[in-house]
């Protein structure tokens, strides 16, 4: 059985073109989603997969209707294969049926591209972090308290002000105050170590 799946990203788009192509190809049942491909929950696709039985084929108008990226597509094709379901894209004229040697070749090519895409993303992310560090930027949230606040915090603490009161003054948790105090203590230890050398 051929099971169609159609997806549009916005409410401004409609499914008519995709559904017409899926019907012309002989899809007996069509499931659809009006949702961005970047969303992980696609109820129409989930229903299509659940409906499909071994020997069925899920048909899409274009590959990008099925997966957000190559990795998602590979994961989905694997899931379909485990169920004995093949996959066909009309626009690209690609059939992925891992029971055939051509289907296996295509699957491995797609898997290689998915890994390549993952590695490119990792390389770009790493290069971005290195470039940011070179400009003096580091990841994570900015510190809540500046050096002036830290000096006042230390003075209040040294004068016996309760941690709870200090935390309320800066609207942070007591754990955060303890963390700042530990950092200040470490800095003082480092300075004393430098002086004694």
Curated annotation (Swiss-Prot):
Extract the GO molecular function terms from the UniProt entry.
Answer: DNA binding; DNA strand exchange activity
Supply the alphabetized keyword list.
DNA integration, DNA recombination, DNA-binding, Plasmid, Transposable element
Q: Which SUPFAM superfamilies does the entry link to? A: Homeodomain-like, Resolvase-like
Xref: Pfam families: HTH_7, Resolvase
The keyword Transmembrane belongs to this UniProt entry's keyword annotation: no
What is a biological process (GO) this protein takes part in? DNA integration
Locate the transmembrane regions by residue number: none
Q: Active site at which residues?
A: 9
> What residues are annotated to bind DNA?
163-182
Domain annotation Resolvase/invertase-type recombinase catalytic: ranges: 1-136
> According to its UniProt entry, what is the function of this protein?
Resolvase catalyzes the resolution (a site-specific recombination) of the cointegrated replicon to yield the final transposition products.
Protein family (similarity comment)? Belongs to the site-specific recombinase resolvase family.
Q: Under which name does UniProt file this protein?
A: Transposon Tn552 resolvase
Q: Which gene encodes it?
A: tnpR
């Amino acid at each position: 059985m051929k099971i169609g799946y159609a997806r549009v990203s916005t409410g401004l788009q409609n499914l008519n073109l995709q559904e017409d192509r899926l019907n012309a190809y002989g899809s007996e049942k069509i499931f659809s989603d009006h949702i961005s491909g970047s969303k992980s929950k696609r109820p129409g696709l989930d229903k299509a997969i659940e409906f499909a039985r071994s020997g069925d084929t899920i048909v899409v108008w274009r590959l990008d209707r099925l997966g957000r990226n190559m990795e998602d597509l590979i994961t989905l094709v694997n899931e379909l294969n485990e169920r004995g379901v093949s996959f066909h894209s009309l626009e690209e004229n690609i059939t992925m049926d891992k029971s055939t040697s051509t289907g296996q070749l295509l699957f491995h090519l797609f898997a290689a591209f998915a890994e390549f895409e993952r590695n490119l993303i990792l390389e770009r992310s790493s290069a971005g972090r290195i470039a940011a560090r070179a400009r003096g930027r580091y990841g994570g949230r900015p510190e809540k308290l500046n050096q002036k606040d830290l000096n006042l915090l230390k003075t209040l603490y040294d004068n016996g002000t309760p941690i709870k009161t200090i935390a309320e003054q800066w609207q942070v948790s007591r754990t955060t105050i303890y963390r700042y105090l530990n950092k200040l203590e470490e800095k003082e230890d480092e300075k004393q170590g430098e002086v004694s050398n």
